[in-house]
């Protein structure tokens, strides 16, 4: 309801400008910070892949997407997490192929 300055009717009341409230801290709950993302990527780069992640990539290489999803679901617990992991591993595989193809051509 927007006040019109009239003292009768549905929109009665004094006209005021609404103050902009600062965002509440609970609105950023669950959102990963830039620093955390950077650190996680660094750790992934240094530590490499877990054995189950290697298995998923092997399954994706031979085109067994459904089996890869099942392996991921078994390890991670939920279908949603498994789908995200499968997509992550397939994107890693895609990057390796595109990066690897360029590197092998340069060697020749």
Swiss-Prot record:
Domain of life: Eukaryota
Biological process (GO), any one: translation
Protein name as catalogued: Large ribosomal subunit protein eL36x
InterPro entries (alphabetical): Ribosomal_eL36 (IPR000509), Ribosomal_eL36_sf (IPR038097)
Gene from which the chain derives: RPL36C
Region of interest (Disordered), ranges: 13-34, 75-108
Entries under Gene3D superfamilies matching the protein: 60S ribosomal protein L36
Family classification: Belongs to the eukaryotic ribosomal protein eL36 family.
Keywords per UniProt: Ribonucleoprotein, Ribosomal protein
Species per Swiss-Prot/TrEMBL record: Arabidopsis thaliana
């Amino acid at each position: 309801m927007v006040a019109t300055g009239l003292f009768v009717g549905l929109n009665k009341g004094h006209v005021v400008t609404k103050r902009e409230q600062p965002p509440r801290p609970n609105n950023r709950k669950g959102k990963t910070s830039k620093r955390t993302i950077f650190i996680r990527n660094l750790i992934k780069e240094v530590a490499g892949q877990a054995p189950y992640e290697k298995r998923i990539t092997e399954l994706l290489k031979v085109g067994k997407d459904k089996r890869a999803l099942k392996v991921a679901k078994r390890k991670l617990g939920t279908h949603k997490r498994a789908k995200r992991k499968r997509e992550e591993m397939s994107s890693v595989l895609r990057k390796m192929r595109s990066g690897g193809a360029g590197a092998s051509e340069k060697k020749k």
